[in-house]
Amino acid sequence: MPRPKLIETPAERKIRLQDMILLRACRNVLGISQRELAQRIGVHFTTIAKAESGHSRLIPAKMEALKAIYRHAGLVFLVGSDGVIRLEIGPKVVEMIAADLAELYPVKAIRVTV
């Protein structure tokens, strides 16, 4: 028997979509696979895939585990009261992605504040 679909409010949908964007963005910035991320927090990789595609949400404890991994790596996402998502990148991450950024953008187009 299929599970019933959950009905979500517009606010809950917005949170789920923000989570999806944050999950994928952080994982891509760090250059890790869905499998590796899943192993780190103790879930199956399809759980990460479903969360990133917006088909499901991670339980709060697993989201906190992900946020802790990202914070430790130097990534902090802030969702403002205006709904704008801002990314703070620590020096470790800047070093990791500096070469990729240099290939994609002219040097004068990159502004890094630490």
Where are these regions (language model features)?
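Residues within the alpha-helical elements of helix-turn-helix
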Residues: 29, 40
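DNA major-groove recognition helix of helix-turn-helix/homeodomain DNA-binding modules
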Residues: 6, 60-78
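Conserved hydrophobic/aromatic packing and binding residues within compact polymer-binding modules
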Residues: 23, 34-38, 48-51
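Short glycine/serine/threonine/alanine-rich loop segments
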Residues: 32, 43, 75
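Recognition helices and adjacent regulatory flanks at domain boundaries
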Residues: 5, 10-12, 34, 77-81
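Recognition helix of helix-turn-helix/homeodomain-like DNA-binding domains
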Residues: 42-58
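Helix-turn-helix/homeodomain-like alpha-helical modules used for DNA recognition
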Residues: 75-114
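A short, Lys/Arg-rich alpha-helix, primarily the initiator
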Residues: 3-28
